[in-house]
Amino acid sequence: MADSYTLGIDCGGSKVMAQSVTYNSITGLVSPGDFQLEVNYSDSPKWNSKFIPVHLDLQRQEFSEGNIYLTQPEMDQGDVIVETIQDIISKSESDSIGLCFPGIKNDRGVVIMANGPRIPDLLERIQGIDSILHDSDCCVLGEWKSTIGKLQNCDNALYIGGGTGIADGIILMGKMIDFNSRDDVKRSWELKMPSGETIESCLSPKGMIEQWNLSQREKVKTLDQLSKNKNADTIFEKAAEAFLFLIQNRARFFKANHAKIEKIVIGQRLGIFMADSKLISLLESNTDIPLDYSTDRRTAALGAAWKRICS
């Protein structure tokens, strides 16, 4: 029995995905509704495709000191993101909205952002939004609490979503963990391999593409383009190493909490690419934990809608 309606909005590093849902109060799951809209920030003539975020160390310092000094490029880029969200909400005509966003948030906005502009006043600029959800959490919730999810009925599972960055998710003993409230587990952008590189820079689609473009004359824009180059094998091998490093780290976390990973779901652009690529064999040879690949890009929006309804 579908008895509730809301809109989920997933704000990524390069686009916004909005999806309406129906909620079933008996199963506790959401299902995709009729309204769906995906908008690239680059559709705006004001979008700066060459935007470079403020160095993370400086972002952390400014946040800890309570004084965030936005650069003009940050403000301009943030304006495009806010206008895109506002336009989507207007078209949806929904007054029940769940919105998720990458980066570190406080109760007003986005205060630390690895792959985009900080928007510390985001909440007050978007009508109808009373909180900003974590994108990683919503990716997991969309897989766990929607009728199209790959993590339904899982009690101990791992989610790895790859796009502009890496979306980390852990379900431990039937509950989704909060990375911000624990000191015994880190996100992929905080985890460094022996080489000094982060998991995120080696495993995310953006990271793999940047590695290639920094070292080659022939530039690529997608993982599909990258995979057609024989010289890219070393990049995919490094991604496999990063994956193994991450899985070993997570396995230790589960063991310390008296549990065992029963399933790993790889999603977002990384999941779509891997579902039909040679990277699968590299990853599957490194673990005996069952792997599944989520190719539906709506899951974070579905998770945001579920969170809005069930909070």
Regions flagged by a language model, labelled:
Residues 2, 285-311:
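Conserved glycine-rich phosphate/nucleotide-binding loop
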Residues 5, 17-59, 128-133, 146-234, ...:
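Glycine/GP-enriched mid-protein hinge/lid loop-to-helix segment characteristic of carbohydrate kinases
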Residues 6-10, 96-98, 156-161, 265:
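Short glycine-aspartate micro-motif
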Residues 14:
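Conserved Rossmann-like nucleotide-cofactor binding loop
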Residues 45-55, 67-86, 90-156, 273-291:
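Glycine-rich phosphate-binding loop and adjoining helix at the ATP-binding site
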Residues 61-95, 209-273, 290-300:
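Adenine-nucleotide phosphate-binding core of ATP-dependent small-molecule kinases
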Residues 103, 163, 270:
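Residue-level signal for short, function-critical loop segments
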